[in-house]
Amino acid sequence: SQIIALDWRCGALLAKLSQPQTPSSLSADIPDITEEIAQKFLALLMATQMLSPETEPTPLMYWEFHDLLFHSRSRIGRHNNPSGGTMRFFGKTEPLPIVKPPMSDKVIKLVQPNLEYLTQIDIPLTKALELRQSIREYDEQPIRLQQLGKLLYCCARIKKIETIETEEFGTLHFSYRPYPCGGAIYELEIYPVVNRCQGLAAGVYHYQPLEHCLYQISAHETQVEELIEDAYKSSGEQDQPQVLLVITARFGRIFWKYESIAYALISKHVGVLYQTFYLMATGMHLAPCALGIGDADNFAQITGLDYYEESSVGEFLLGSVRN
């Protein structure tokens, strides 16, 4: 149902219904609105299912305003706004590039694992699914750089870039990676924050998925400690994290195509990347743990990112399994 208010008094009545009202209190202070009119207005709203009897406990009691708005606005059915791949910025701006430009000149090359060999020795998918669990305690010997590189390669590298010519939207570029992504857009970036890793100095790095390498952004001990401490608290304070994978989104890359559902898609992409990390880490006998919260402002300040252009949207802990 939809209400189109042709008189300001209708809007005033609706606004007052944000608080508990009786017909008498509803009609007060609004010119020419009597208690009888207020009763008929309420009857109309009930008949059109704009109002419904309150149940005990009401399901609405569990909702926060922003959660319900996000849920209803990113699904169809309760609004008439454009939704989906509307290409709303076509002709206004160019899409962001598939690969983010280097953030520093300090490059750490990563070893590419032998995928053919891995397919022969890796544990079956069903076993990985059954063994998967969140592990927050680590061995004294930390994760190795080779293991970190293998996980990033198997989970997040760019396997292929494809260019398609379209009549309506011109030239479009896509990439393909191990985890799925709506429209093959891949707006997510991965920033390893290293506390303890054999073969890699502590610091904040950016993973370049095409060249399969790390760019060091910061070696500042205080900044690393700050991010690690936040992750430690978010994970239940069981053990100091060895590596924190901060996942960001380059918003413009996905907002360029999708309308109404873009941020919901980002959340789904973070979820499938989490599961990909989990299964790969389980197969590698590592300790994985997804986090539910992180400080996007603090990460933006440390990395120099523009909060509205690229912000952290997920965090994932990785370390060596305690023997």
Task: Label every model-predicted segment.
Residues 304-323:
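A glycine-rich helix N-cap at a beta->alpha junction
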Residues 2-121, 130, 159:
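Long, charge-rich, low-complexity alpha-helical segments
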Residues 111-137, 248-260:
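Residues forming anionic-ligand binding surfaces in small-molecule and nucleic-acid pockets
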Residues 126, 141-144:
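Cell wall/extracellular polymer interaction/catalysis modules
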Residues 145-199:
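Active-site pocket-lining segments that scaffold enzyme catalytic pockets across diverse folds
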Residues 256, 281-302, 309:
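Short conserved catalytic/interaction loops centered on acidic-Pro-aromatic/His motifs
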Residues 181-274:
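Glycine/small-residue-rich phosphate/adenosyl-binding loop
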